[in-house]
Amino acid sequence: KAGVGFKAGVKDYRLTYYTPDYETKDTDILAAFRVTPQPGVPAEEAGAAVAAESSTGTWTTVWTDGLTSLDRYKGRCYHIEAVVGEENQFIAYVAYPLDLFEEGSVTNMFTSIVGNVFGFKALRALRLEDLRIPPSYSKTFQGPPHGIQVERDKLNKYGRPLLGCTIKPKLGLSAKNYGRAVYECLRGGLDFTKDDENVNSQPFMRWRDRFVFCAEAIYKAQAETGEIKGHYLNATAGTCEEMIKRAVFARELGAPIVMHDYLTGGFTANTSLAHYCRDNGLLLHIHRAMHAVIDRQKNHGMHFRVLAKALRMSGGDHIHAGTVVGKLEGEREMTLGFVDLLRDDFIEKDRSRGIFFTQDWVSMPGVIPVASGGIHVWHMPALTEIFGDDSVLQFGGGTLGHPWGNAPGAVANRVALEACVQARNEGRDLAREGNEIIREAAKWSPELAAACEVWK
């Protein structure tokens, strides 16, 4: 009797998982995969294989399939289109029923969608380009601990981008000298300074010493400037328990913000830290160390916009998002695409910016994008125009490399930023008149003039 209706053996995935007539539901999680099949494998079979292996399928028919409703739980490849200008490359759209995923777990979502299928031998390469997260799923996540508006209110800073600086050299300084550099940068006019992503708790500088000296620097700079200051204290550690212990100590010192390396630390650790930060009034800065391992290849891995969406769900108030400046125009559009996905409530589908699906975040708070890496005062007009007010512009070498020292480097950046914001508010075109605006400001700021000379 057990054998009735059950036929053992291997059958093509497309017979079950390729359903071009399927109408997607509002509750489905939708994925866009860039699929490069092996020679001789049809696109439909490759797309169906991805849907199967990332949902209910396995390599052969099993009789326990009859004990559940595959129609209810299977992923479906519902549309395939060829990639223009690429030979044997396709975008496969897959719909996943919501019941396949644990609520509030980015870890489980990724384990399902990208956990197993990337090593599949029918595929030469596979890249997850985008995900549509339905409100019915995103609502199961807390999201960013505080979000953009709450951060502005905490800092009492409005109407301009925030300024940051990564302390260099990133490894080798003692805690006392590290704290001194933090103080000089904040005293000069920056809003934030930052631990580098690989500063955790090494023999030359243990975390507790660093936290204490940085807190002292923050309070001293606040007292002298009358502005609220912060330093991203990197709480990333070898265990979740140790990470939370460091965050607790940061809170006890009265620090306003901590930091986490969310890809090396992992999504489970990140979500735990985000929950702690919301409950205890700490802002959370996120560094994306290791992202290029996942997102750099154009035909394999995962696009950063997917990692950015996952971070917004898992929780973070800031995340690094590249700089755009000096890159290709196309990359600018792609970067601004995922910057919008981080900040806005509702983002329309726009393939020219790499956005494959309309994304509705409903009321989930936004994340502030951080522009960092190789930027200096001459880039300030472009950065102000491209990223707008809700951003952090981070100048590491562009502050600490100033010929007169750290504090004058900070002054130069603050003067350049204030000049750009004022010019923008007066209706001037930053893209066209940027260099002229910086030159005018440099006439009455010797610190800015010196910086302009070094990086001209």
Swiss-Prot record:
Positions bearing N6,N6,N6-trimethyllysine: 7
Coiled coil: none
Ligand binding (Mg(2+)): 194, 196-197
Site feature (Transition state stabilizer) residues: 327
Domain of life, per lineage: Eukaryota
EC class of the enzyme, as a word: lyase
Misc remark: The basic functional RuBisCO is composed of a large chain homodimer in a 'head-to-tail' conformation. In form I RuBisCO this homodimer is arranged in a barrel-like tetramer with the small subunits forming a tetrameric 'cap' on each end of the 'barrel'.
UniProt similarity note: Belongs to the RuBisCO large chain family. Type I subfamily.
Annotated protein name in UniProt: Ribulose bisphosphate carboxylase large chain
Organism: Barnardia japonica
